[in-house]
A protein has these predicted regions:
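PRPP-associated nucleotide enzymes
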Residues: 1-236
Length: 236
């Protein structure tokens, strides 16, 4: 970075001889979006095309404008999508792993971008999960991707649900099933883990109420905010 905090971008000199380059952008914060924009702008100025590997789609959970009791929350994914569309003449393709929402992909395509989606079943390490008895989706939003893995493993699927507690307004995770899960091996599947609240709550329910034997988890994208790497072992 420069002394004022601006991002410094350096591209190799021999890039001028390229007709098309591959870009892998693992974006973890807003500065990554800005850095990608700078690179795309330079490539466009030089007339160089690119294939963009974007494993995690930034702002994908902020895909709707919202009005709360205290503020407005903008559709920040729309802003990011429009940034990418500014460079659609040089972006030959965008490859994304297990996107959070199909609507996000539809928007990118509507803006003239070609998107290659890698499904969760294409990255799932099948050999690592051969002794699973049940697969659980932590909510309705994860049902489709969880169903894909359940089909791969040929095991039953259970879908939990989230409800807002009217007393404290907090989101609570509920698992209602009459299945006997005692001493069973459970696999939880989701696309994103951030603070880990859903995983923590589901694990607690499975251990305390259903006496399961073992809980495994497969997540496509690990955000792991708030130092979650250190807190997950003690919480589960």
């Amino acid at each position: 970075k420069y002394s004022d905090g601006s991002i410094e971008v350096k591209l190799p000199l021999d890039i001028k001889h390229k007709e098309c380059v591959n870009i892998r952008a693992v974006i973890t914060d807003v500065s990554g979006i800005l850095l990608l924009t700078y690179v795309l702008e330079q490539l466009q100025c030089m007339g160089i095309k690119c294939k963009l590997d974007l494993p995690y789609l930034p702002n994908s959970r902020q895909e709707r404008s919202q009005k709360t009791d205290s503020c407005y929350k903008p559709n920040s994914f729309l802003s990011f999508a429009r940034i990418l569309s500014n460079y659609k003449t040089i972006i030959e393709s965008i490859t994304i792993i297990d996107p959070h929402s199909e609507d996000n992909i539809s928007l990118l395509e509507l803006l003239g971008l070609y998107v290659n989606v890698i499904s969760i079943k294409d990255i799932f390490p099948l050999d690592n999960f051969q002794n699973i008895d049940y697969i659980i989706s932590p909510d309705e939003g994860a049902r489709k991707r969880t169903s894909l893995i359940a089909t791969l493993l040929n095991v039953p699927m259970i879908v939990a649900r989230k409800e807002r507690n009217p007393d404290n307004r907090e989101i609570e995770l509920i698992l209602n099933t009459e299945l006997d899960l005692k001493d069973k091996n459970i696999l939880v599947v989701d696309d994103i883990i951030d603070y880990g609240n859903s995983l923590h709550d589901l694990t607690k329910i499975l251990k305390e109420n259903y006496k399961v034997k073992r809980i495994s988890c497969f997540i496509s994208h690990a955000i792991l905010s708030s130092n979650l790497r250190l807190t997950i072992p003690s919480r589960t």
